[in-house]
A protein has these predicted regions:
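Catalytic toxin/effector domains delivered as secreted proteins or via bacterial secretion systems
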Residues: 2-114
Length: 114
């Protein structure tokens, strides 16, 4: 089913994280099985509490072969090069075969993958 015809199911952060982990999205990206594209990289002028100055807020798009969008995640890149929070990307959107999982704060869908 094309992504534009799949229903969107809004779920909790825990549910989307479980599915992201089950699908091994970050592991597959690190192995080169998925393309990982940095879509946004913004320096935080006023970082949230507990996040150091000079931290960047990043949106990452994960693509399967054939340029099919699989996932969208957010992460804080700390000044030392490590990731803030849990130390892992925070999934916001996950494209499954029959539906799209999303959290309400999700980044907008890629223009070609609405």
């Amino acid at each position: 089913m094309p992504p534009d015809q799949r229903p969107v199911e809004f779920v909790s952060n825990n549910i989307i994280r479980q599915e992201f982990n089950r699908m091994q999205v970050e592991i597959r990206a690190n192995l080169g099985e998925l393309s990982k594209i940095l879509s946004r990289n913004s320096h935080l002028a006023h970082p949230p509490e507990g996040i150091p100055y000079c931290t960047n807020s990043q949106i990452i798009y994960y693509y399967e072969q054939g340029n099919n969008l699989l996932a969208v995640a957010h992460q804080y890149l700390l000044p030392d090069g490590s990731l803030g929070g849990s130390g892992k990307p925070d999934p916001k959107r996950l494209v499954l075969s029959d539906r799209i999982l999303a959290v309400r704060s999700a980044a907008p869908a890629h223009p070609n993958q609405v």
